Amino acid sequence: MNLLNLFNPLQTAGMEEEFDAIKIGIASPETIRSWSYGEVKKPETINYRTFKPERDGLFCAKIFGPVKDYECLCGKYKRLKFKGVTCEKCGVEVTLSKVRRERMGHIELAAPVAHIWFLKSLPSRLGMVLDMTLRDIERVLYFEAFVVTDPGMTPLQRRQLLTEDDYYNKLDEYGDDFDAKMGAEGIRELLRTLNVAGEIEILRQELESTGSDTKIKKIAKRLKVLEAFHRSGMKLEWMIMDVLPVLPPDLRPLVPLDGGRFATSDLNDLYRRVINRNNRLKRLLELHAPDIIVRNEKRMLQEAVDSLLDNGRRGKAMTGANKRPLKSLADMIKGKGGRFRQNLLGKRVDYSGRSVITVGPYLRLHQCGLPKKMALELFKPFIFHKLEKQGLASTVKAAKKLVEQEVPEVWDILEEVIREHPIMLNRAPTLHRLGIQAFEPILIEGKAIQLHPLVCAAFNADFDGDQMAVHVPLSLEAQMEARTLMLASNNVLSPANGEPIIVPSQDIVLGLYYMTRDRINAKGEGSLFADVKEVHRAYHTKQVELGTKITVRLREWVKNEAGEFEPVVNRYETTVGRALLSEILPKGLPFEYVNKALKKKEISKLINASFRLCGLRDTVIFADHLMYTGFGFAAKGGISIAVDDMEIPKEKAALLAEANAEVKEIEDQYRQGLVTNGERYNKVVDIWGRAGDKIAKAMMDNLSKQKVIDRAGNEVDQESFNSIYMMADSGARGSAAQIKQLSGMRGLMAKPDGSIIETPITSNFREGLTVLQYFIATHGARKGLADTALKTANSGYLTRRLVDVTQDLVVVEDDCGTSDGFVMKAVVQGGDVIEALRDRILGRVTASDVVDPSSGETLVEAGTLLTEKLVDMIDQSGVDEVKVRTPITCKTRHGLCAHCYGRDLARGKLVNAGEAVGVIAAQSIGEPGTQLTMRTFHIGGAASRAAAASQVEAKSNGTARFSSQMRYVANNKGELVVIGRSCEVVIHDDIGRERERHKVPYGAILLVQDGMAIKAGQTLATWDPHTRPMITEHAGMVKFENVEEGVTVAKQTDDVTGLSTLVVIDGKRRSSSASKLLRPTVKLLDENGVEICIPGTSTPVSMAFPVGAVITVREGQEIGKGDVLARIPQASSKTRDITGGLPRVAELFEARVPKDAGMLAEITGTVSFGKETKGKQRLIVTDVDGVAYETLISKEKQILVHDGQVVNRGETIVDGAVDPHDILRLQGIEALARYIVQEVQEVYRLQGVKISDKHIEVIIRQMLRRVNIADAGETGFITGEQVERGDVMAANEKALEEGKEPARYENVLLGITKASLSTDSFISAASFQETTRVLTEAAIMGKQDELRGLKENVIVGRLIPAGTGLTYHRSRHQQWQEVEQETAETQVTDE
């Protein structure tokens, strides 16, 4: 390091200081003066003739330093030998001109001025400290009122406002007994005379005595600010400024343009205004001008300083000559173009270039093709060095010349330099860490970068004109990291789900599929071959075809006990293509993996298996060979598309006719009044949806089979070799949905709002569309395009918020030693096991022993990482649930431990210390978001909606069980009618494991009994999907109450049918105010005309009709249990797609309270209903001890419980979306985590995107990182404040050690934006959002940033404390501790 110091004249001692934290505070006037090198007295900038700075002006050389290196302004002293001399003529110190970037000046203000950030940044800090409203403070500051600063012996109050008239009246009355001031002086006086310590005492006492919640909150806020001031030793009056610092001139440059004009930074304008007004005010004060004039000038000065600090925050923004607002100091640092995001977090780097990408099908996975021109430019310094070293050039200049002339030696040297020097390729947008990968460059001619096709999936690149950037790692360490961590061949698995991301697609898949398909009766069928070489010869001499079925002897390599490979020879029935493919299989991969037609999914499985069985190196080589082979056979196969390949099924006409007939029938029923218009629409849409599916099925059946003659001469079906079918079937391109549009029928289309147009497009693209059909189609297709453009931005913003909330989460230790965890079960939805238990626990660490349910022996001990082998064993033993460790319950303070996180998905083993798991989680969730937004636009607006379900069927054999919430009654026909709201039928297999779980809606008819044995395919329950019934649980005679035509119900006569029905009117729409409160209800009478009561109570049965219900019973009608009283038509369905998805994910992570949230029971107890109020019902839950909890529920909402029902705490009692905050409060962290994980996964699953639960849990951990102090105990916290969980834990441990009372706290769920802003690091929060507010708050609190996260370290320009940087930080920390210890020891010896 000493050598460097010689060459760096600025390197005075102490420039290289190491620091461990950054503290922010309010600068005192003394501090500001100590920074300054002189006072700026004049608004002049530079002399426009000589271009020299004016003295005492904004660019003064005397204050800020010389304009030219080592040269004073008048030119008396020049050169290095006068370094440090101050010229006696012009007063300029002879030194480097770059001091003009760091020397500050100051302006002495003639009157104090309030700092706008402390005044206007909400909540107003000045207002908080003084306990005055913002409006009042502004009136004082801007000279509209006086404030009493010292009431003396008068009855006036301190801080009381007086208008001018009041003030003069009081002056007459009391004379000089009191003091009142105007402007910033008045506020400053109030601040100066406030006794902080005393005020804190008073507030603490008030806190204990007061009972009102709002008051507690208000006092706690004020207390926090005052305590911060008290602790940090900052004075309150520093929020009012006497001195204004002036930014160094080179940071607000003035550049002469040609033509005698100047380009200047807006700050100079703002400073000029301040100086002008300040000087004018000084003169006015010297002249003893009248009060009113001085006041006006002071107000103008205040406004000028406001504009300089934060233009436009108060009043109108100051504008320059061109009418746009001037850019103030605050604007310089905030927003996307501000200092934080533009310059500190987003730097541009040298040694980089970009170019278009093309395919490099002959490359190996770790290589890329780099154009010679680019390489020459990028590796210049290395080439210069080599040229000098070999003596071809004596100076850098000479070397430069040689390179420019491109002499032959230069190319040889370039080859040498480039060898084994990895470069990094990046494609924007970089959505996850695989968006930048390292490759070894291969020099190529031309100007395009060649990219290996298999990494396209990771970069999301295609070759339609995409560009990529190249970066060169310079230092040895950087090259090493690029090679070991970032080389493409080291990134085979995706960090999001642990599956291979190096997976063949498109042509490669098509080639491999074509190669491994079998043909019936191909040339040479049934031949026997001794080995693969023989197959080769036969194929090349055209004795056999690629798809010929043959028998062949193959040698495979199998591991023995010792783990060494041994050859095993087997005979296989296979095809020629598969036998040829067997040659490239790595050792240890069984042939049966390729002995089938390889589709995209199969190939992915193949690569996965290869990675697990044969390791990384072999897999990479294998993937490359797969690619070469695939491309080769895709070329030989000659698969193309012709119009004739789109075969239209013969059954189409019949199916359309059938659908038309059904629609006609529904229309007839509608005319007769048997169905409402809404039901008609729903049924029509369903019919067309089904017809489309049937045609699609007929088409696919037709496409996928073709008739051929086999060897015996019989006609048989074989899988088709239709090009379009092969493309879709192999997964290379296209899907059944797209083929359906080509040769089936286009089907139903959606309007831009998502509702479905009921007339479908019956033609397909091959037949062509009529004008009307074409118009309907464009409707949806254009929406797709518009959506994509709009949604990409949203998705990027979601990723940004996620990264920001998790950026400081790093694995810092091996094991935190907790035994907490979550219990994992398989995810069962509808009839299917959506995610098996094995997939959910793979790569996790067990939190408790896993015990075999049948034998009771321990299968896996606690603390074991679950590998594929162990998971399979658990799966076979029939274990239903496993308790695993999770990031949410990890006890590590700052960061995570490896055991709670589990396996590093991209590497396949336990995660290493230093892995930035937070950022990986954020990227894994954010990256598919962008993909999902683009997915919609490819199908082109075709409606994708499942026909509404009207029944559930069992999918497997077993025993039917009813869930605990199941309630049903038997009606007169003997059918079981469900009357519970959240009922489920669960099916268990013979061992008793849950296999299926089906929701059955209210009003469904059950076709099975509890405990009944059932077969697969048996219907369990049926219901009407389009209406929701209202069912009676008691029998009797109908008696209506408040069912008055024209008041509470309307008689609706259908124009088409002439039939009338009674429909309940919405209370808000009713005419008279009295009728708004009436609720149409139905009561039941027995044969004597007495009201029937609920059994066991004296409450009469009374059921209210909901709004919009169509009443189906008449007054006086006899009804039995389970009969339908009314039908509520369901709204028509819309198409579901990721639009519902992305905002849904954002909503979950932002922890927003849903619009019409449902309600959960606060306590466990019995439900009863109390006295109703206007428009609300009173629901009461009484627990065992008789404590009642009551709540009012608006009548529009659907209550899911009934009188006398027992509910558990946290059970849903009012229908609606669940509020996550309620789940956390009533059911705890595990239930909350399960809810969020499930909901987020559902969105992604709908799109077929796999993300590990782990990543979502990491984010939930960050959302739960703060807690609310419920009772501070004897710790230093304030009751009601929000603090980091780790801080409370630490404080409680300390309190318990000292025998004090620990604090009690409640969990809080914060949305990701809020969590990012409430982080302890103010640098991280300020660079995220609301910069002004964050910095203001931090300055007042005198916050210290410990630089723990990644972001803060990037901003201060250090290695990040993750990955290889973690060791650097740790060693520094250790050294620091050792130094501290030494100093402590020396002090002891000194004493």
UniProtKB/Swiss-Prot annotation:
<dbReference type="Pfam" id="PF04997">
    <property type="entry name" value="RNA_pol_Rpb1_1"/>
</dbReference>
<keyword id="KW-0804">Transcription</keyword>
<dbReference type="Pfam" id="PF05000">
    <property type="entry name" value="RNA_pol_Rpb1_4"/>
</dbReference>
<dbReference type="InterPro" id="IPR007066">
    <property type="entry name" value="RNA_pol_Rpb1_3"/>
</dbReference>
<feature type="binding site">
    <location>
        <position position="74"/>
    </location>
    <ligand>
        <name>Zn(2+) 1</name>
    </ligand>
</feature>
<dbReference type="InterPro" id="IPR042102">
    <property type="entry name" value="RNA_pol_Rpb1_3_sf"/>
</dbReference>
<dbReference type="GO" id="GO:0008270">
    <property type="term" value="F:zinc ion binding"/>
</dbReference>
<protein>
    <recommendedName>
        <fullName>DNA-directed RNA polymerase subunit beta'</fullName>
        <ecNumber>2.7.7.6</ecNumber>
    </recommendedName>
</protein>
<keyword id="KW-0808">Transferase</keyword>
<dbReference type="GO" id="GO:0000287">
    <property type="term" value="F:magnesium ion binding"/>
</dbReference>
<dbReference type="InterPro" id="IPR045867">
    <property type="entry name" value="DNA-dir_RpoC_beta_prime"/>
</dbReference>
<comment type="subunit">
    <text>The RNAP catalytic core consists of 2 alpha, 1 beta, 1 beta' and 1 omega subunit. When a sigma factor is associated with the core the holoenzyme is formed, which can initiate transcription.</text>
</comment>
<dbReference type="InterPro" id="IPR007080">
    <property type="entry name" value="RNA_pol_Rpb1_1"/>
</dbReference>
<feature type="binding site">
    <location>
        <position position="462"/>
    </location>
    <ligand>
        <name>Mg(2+)</name>
    </ligand>
</feature>
<comment type="similarity">
    <text>Belongs to the RNA polymerase beta' chain family.</text>
</comment>
<dbReference type="Pfam" id="PF04998">
    <property type="entry name" value="RNA_pol_Rpb1_5"/>
</dbReference>
<comment type="function">
    <text>DNA-dependent RNA polymerase catalyzes the transcription of DNA into RNA using the four ribonucleoside triphosphates as substrates.</text>
</comment>
<feature type="binding site">
    <location>
        <position position="900"/>
    </location>
    <ligand>
        <name>Zn(2+) 2</name>
    </ligand>
</feature>
<keyword id="KW-0460">Magnesium</keyword>
<dbReference type="InterPro" id="IPR006592">
    <property type="entry name" value="RNA_pol_N"/>
</dbReference>
<keyword id="KW-0862">Zinc</keyword>
<feature type="binding site">
    <location>
        <position position="90"/>
    </location>
    <ligand>
        <name>Zn(2+) 1</name>
    </ligand>
</feature>
<dbReference type="InterPro" id="IPR012754">
    <property type="entry name" value="DNA-dir_RpoC_beta_prime_bact"/>
</dbReference>
<feature type="binding site">
    <location>
        <position position="466"/>
    </location>
    <ligand>
        <name>Mg(2+)</name>
    </ligand>
</feature>
<dbReference type="GO" id="GO:0003899">
    <property type="term" value="F:DNA-directed RNA polymerase activity"/>
</dbReference>
<keyword id="KW-0240">DNA-directed RNA polymerase</keyword>
<feature type="binding site">
    <location>
        <position position="72"/>
    </location>
    <ligand>
        <name>Zn(2+) 1</name>
    </ligand>
</feature>
<dbReference type="Pfam" id="PF00623">
    <property type="entry name" value="RNA_pol_Rpb1_2"/>
</dbReference>
<feature type="binding site">
    <location>
        <position position="87"/>
    </location>
    <ligand>
        <name>Zn(2+) 1</name>
    </ligand>
</feature>
<dbReference type="GO" id="GO:0000428">
    <property type="term" value="C:DNA-directed RNA polymerase complex"/>
</dbReference>
<dbReference type="Pfam" id="PF04983">
    <property type="entry name" value="RNA_pol_Rpb1_3"/>
</dbReference>
<dbReference type="InterPro" id="IPR038120">
    <property type="entry name" value="Rpb1_funnel_sf"/>
</dbReference>
<keyword id="KW-0548">Nucleotidyltransferase</keyword>
<dbReference type="InterPro" id="IPR007081">
    <property type="entry name" value="RNA_pol_Rpb1_5"/>
</dbReference>
<feature type="binding site">
    <location>
        <position position="890"/>
    </location>
    <ligand>
        <name>Zn(2+) 2</name>
    </ligand>
</feature>
<dbReference type="GO" id="GO:0006351">
    <property type="term" value="P:DNA-templated transcription"/>
</dbReference>
<feature type="binding site">
    <location>
        <position position="897"/>
    </location>
    <ligand>
        <name>Zn(2+) 2</name>
    </ligand>
</feature>
<dbReference type="GO" id="GO:0003677">
    <property type="term" value="F:DNA binding"/>
</dbReference>
<dbReference type="InterPro" id="IPR044893">
    <property type="entry name" value="RNA_pol_Rpb1_clamp_domain"/>
</dbReference>
<dbReference type="InterPro" id="IPR000722">
    <property type="entry name" value="RNA_pol_asu"/>
</dbReference>
<dbReference type="InterPro" id="IPR007083">
    <property type="entry name" value="RNA_pol_Rpb1_4"/>
</dbReference>
<feature type="binding site">
    <location>
        <position position="464"/>
    </location>
    <ligand>
        <name>Mg(2+)</name>
    </ligand>
</feature>
